[in-house]
A protein has these predicted regions:
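Extended, subdomain-level signal for the structured scaffold at the beginning of enzyme domains
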Residues: 1-75, 84-93, 105-113, 121-159
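Short, thiol/selenol-centered motifs that function as redox-active sites or metal-ligating centers
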Residues: 78-79
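Cytochrome P450 catalytic-domain "roof"
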Residues: 118
């Protein structure tokens, strides 16, 4: 099966209808509270404002990230969202990155100003400019390097 068939979105806002910070309407597949995470391989926090504070305020999100990180399951965050992982103590002693305006919020982390940073089961990216390498790294982790290479070629990403 492809990654698309096994990917779903969950809303942390209490509504399946989400309006992004850039006024893009998204309909999540479920509310975060409705998901059975036992078969989930990776949790991704998308970041942005007000998305990041909404993620930080959702107990299901924070409990799930903590459980995943502590059990060795994959957790990823981009833009401002790595600050949520830091606030939970999940970046303590780990290499990480975040949007430049949030790097000072990565308490306990070894901060790198790079597109994507992987440390064990935690992957972080600095923001929209790193979204493609971030996504390709997650594909590599879940489906292997051949699939990541195939997608990179298909989207003509030469970075």
């Amino acid at each position: 099966s492809s990654l698309r068939e096994t990917t779903f979105s969950a809303s942390a806002s209490g509504s399946r209808e989400i309006l992004s910070s850039h006024k893009i309407r998204i309909t999540a597949d479920a509310l975060a509270e409705e998901v059975d995470y036992s078969d989930v391989d990776l949790v991704v926090l998308p970041g942005g404002i007000p998305g990041t504070p909404n993620l930080a305020a959702n107990k299901t999100v924070t409990d799930t990230c903590t459980a995943f990180a502590k059990s060795g399951k994959k957790v990823a965050a981009i833009c401002a969202a790595p600050s949520v992982l830091a606030s939970l103590g999940l970046l303590e002693g780990k290499n990480a990155t975040a949007h430049a305006g949030f790097q000072d919020k990565l308490a306990g982390a070894i901060v790198h100003d790079e597109e994507v940073v992987v440390d064990g089961n935690i992957t972080t990216s600095y923001g929209l400019g790193g979204a493609i390498p971030f996504a390709l790294e997650l594909v590599r982790q879940l489906a292997g390097p051949a699939e990541a290479d195939r997608i990179q070629k298909a989207i003509a990403y030469r970075h």
